[in-house]
UniProtKB/Swiss-Prot annotation:
Its EC number is 6.1.1.1. ATP binds at K243. Keywords: Aminoacyl-tRNA synthetase, ATP-binding, Cytoplasm, Ligase, Nucleotide-binding, Protein biosynthesis, RNA-binding. GO terms for biological process: tyrosyl-tRNA aminoacylation. It comes from Halalkalibacterium halodurans (strain ATCC BAA-125 / DSM 18197 / FERM 7344 / JCM 9153 / C-125) (Bacillus halodurans). A motif ('HIGH' region) lies at residues 56-65. This is Tyrosine--tRNA ligase. It catalyses: tRNA(Tyr) + L-tyrosine + ATP = L-tyrosyl-tRNA(Tyr) + AMP + diphosphate + H(+). Catalyzes the attachment of tyrosine to tRNA(Tyr) in a two-step reaction: tyrosine is first activated by ATP to form Tyr-AMP and then transferred to the acceptor end of tRNA(Tyr). CDD domains: S4 (cd00165), TyrRS_core (cd00805). PROSITE patterns: AA_TRNA_LIGASE_I (PS00178), S4 (PS50889).
């Protein structure tokens, strides 16, 4: 039976959704299928099922992770259903995407604890009450060996080795465990089990997303559309944002820390951060980009707005205002902040500067404390410490500063 043509209002709605959903994406595979799925959704009133798979091996969410979350929120706001797939089963293997060596497996307890952290932090962007939460152990644990052989028969070793990370490891003689080949197969099978219409991931996940599309066809399902999002560069402006590279902004960090880190984003990346990591409209983003280009907007002011926007998104309006004022006080006027945490000192005096920094939790280890002093990153009452062997006389009101944003005031 031939489908009825869309009404002018329905056609307008399809175009509206496509304009929003194409924002910031790298690739839609295939793009015409996305249009067809949205047309069907608008015609029938049935929401699309949009999947995001999570490997709960590193649960602290940073701005880089939020790129896909903002896209999911757009789908939610358009009335579609978000499928949050916790890879508790696949997490025991660990996603080998982009890895140069075999990853250690996680215990069930680690996977579950990390999954809880994900859900809590994702709720800062997504409406978790409107998202459906799934654990892939529900169906993957139920597969018998015959099912696994059937699944494995859908893919060749040659095709697996087309994956960039596997290819590099194979050519360099690095071992690849057979179980790692099952990760993309299992992730693809998740789409079969969930009957997903769309799956979203970073560009490093493209192979896995297309695996879902291929397996859905093999199992007689409608094929999902794969949408890839950019991997945002970190604060160094070169490598992708990563906690291990210490070039990240964590969404759970303190407001002043988020704001201060935003001020260190390279100028050339500001517009990308605005587009991919904030909730500002494209008209607002375009206006900022135009202002930066024609010189009517100073890069410092654009960064301050970006920092305030990020703090507002994850902490609130009041905290954003306070972070702006804190930054102006500490860095623009070169004064000390008014709310320096006070620590009652009952220890020895004098005390070795390295021990002092670790005791005050300003640095996590003596090694890092030594390096920070040697690099000129430690001040006492505004004076730079140059001697790593310095014995510090503890006096009431002594202000210890590490880097640009960490302060402690000692009271006796």
């Amino acid at each position: 039976m031939e489908e009825k043509a869309l009404t002018p209002e329905q056609t307008q709605e399809v175009e509206r959704q496509l304009e929003i959903l194409k924002r910031g994406v790298v690739e839609i595979v295939p793009e015409e299928a996305l249009r067809e799925k949205i047309e069907k959704s608008v015609r029938t009133g049935k929401p699309l099922k949009v999947k995001l798979g999570m490997d709960p091996s590193a649960p602290d969410v940073h701005i880089g992770h939020t790129v896909v979350l903002h896209k999911l929120r757009q789908f939610q706001d358009l009335g579609h259903e978000v499928q949050m797939l916790i890879g508790d089963f696949t997490g025991r293997i660990g996603d080998p995407s982009g890895k140069s060596e075999t990853r250690k497996q996680l215990t069930d307890e680690q996977v579950k604890a990390n999954a809880r952290t994900y859900v809590e932090q994702y709720g800062k962007i997504l409406d978790m009450e409107k998202a459906t939460l799934h654990y892939n152990s529900k169906w993957l644990s139920a597969l018998n060996f015959e099912d696994v052989i059937k699944l494995a028969s859908q893919m060749t070793v040659a095709r697996m080795l087309e994956r960039d990370d596997f290819e590099k490891r194979y050519k360099s003689g690095q071992p690849i465990s057979i179980h790692e080949f099952f990760y993309p197969l299992m992730q693809g099978y998740d789409s079969v089990a969930l009957e997903s219409d769309i799956e979203i991931g970073g560009t490093d996940q493209k192979f896995n997303l297309l695996m879902g599309r291929m397996l859905q066809e093999a199992y007689g399902n409608d094929k999902q559309v794969a949408i890839t999002m950019p991997l945002i560069e970190g604060l160094d402006g070169e490598r992708k944002m990563s906690k291990s590279l210490n070039n990240y902004i964590g969404i759970d960090e303190a407001p002043n820390e988020i704001f201060g880190k935003a001020m260190s984003i390279p100028d050339e990346l500001m517009v990308k951060y605005y587009e991919l990591a904030t909730d500002l409209s494209m008209d607002e983003v375009k206006a900022i980009a135009k202002g930066l280009e024609d010189g009517s907007v100073h890069p410092r002011d654009a960064k301050m707005k970006l920092g305030a926007t990020l703090v507002r998104m994850y902490h609130g309006e009041k905290e954003a205002e306070e972070a702006v004022n804190y930054f102006k006080t500490v860095f623009q006027k070169r004064d000390l902040p008014t709310d320096i945490p006070e620590v009652k000192w009952d220890g020895e005096s004098p005390v070795w500067i390295v021990d002092l920094l670790v005791t005050l939790d300003l640095l996590p280890s003596k090694g890092e404390a030594r390096r920070m002093v040697q690099n000129g990153g430690v001040k006492l009452n505004g004076e730079k410490v140059e001697d790593v062997q310095l014995q510090v006389e503890i006096e009431d009101g002594l202000i210890v500063q590490v880097g640009k944003r960490k302060f402690k005031k000692l009271v006796r």
